[in-house]
Amino acid sequence: IFDSRAPGFVSGAICDKNTLNACFLGLPHWACQPEQSVNYVSCHDDYTLFDRLALVNPDAPRQTLIRQNRLAAAFVFLSQGVPFLQAGEEILRTKPKGRGKFDDNSYRSPDRVNAIRWDTLESPEYQETLAYYKGLIAFRKAHEGLRQTGREAVQASVFPVETGNPKAVCYRVEDR
């Protein structure tokens, strides 16, 4: 059951390694092939990624939320399957309702909630986050091992590495 206020791995919660492994490996228990797995951390049907991180970590400094956003993006782009982003995720999009609340179902909300704030894009935090996303996309494109198209190829090229740290996830990916 999805709980938008429950912290996940990106927010510092200790999560089941088998679940994390399955995500990185293209959900082999659910999808026959990795390209049948669509990887995302936010979509139009719920909070934006940044809003969810802020809800889960209400006292976290903005820079912590930005780092968590980038970690979530790394999960999306470094996992087997099809990456999917909500519009504006790469520029820390938020849908504020006012009084510290965020809109989780904004299809009837006005433009002031749904609009992408293009005037903020010159800010260094937005530029740095956008550059980070672009770097992840380029990295994924450059390494075929991150874009396997068959279950056997994933099994032959992606290997979880045990770190002994419950808050660390590590993989070795080989381009073949």
Predicted regions and their residues:
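Conserved alpha/beta catalytic core and glycan-binding cleft of carbohydrate-active enzymes
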Residues: 1-92, 96-97, 107, 144, ...
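Residues that flank catalytic or metal-binding motifs in active/ligand-binding sites
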Residues: 36-37, 112, 132, 167
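Charged, low-complexity, helix-prone segments enriched in Lys/Glu/Asp/Gln
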Residues: 62-71, 113, 133, 137-140
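Catalytic cores of secreted or luminal carbohydrate-active enzymes
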Residues: 117-151
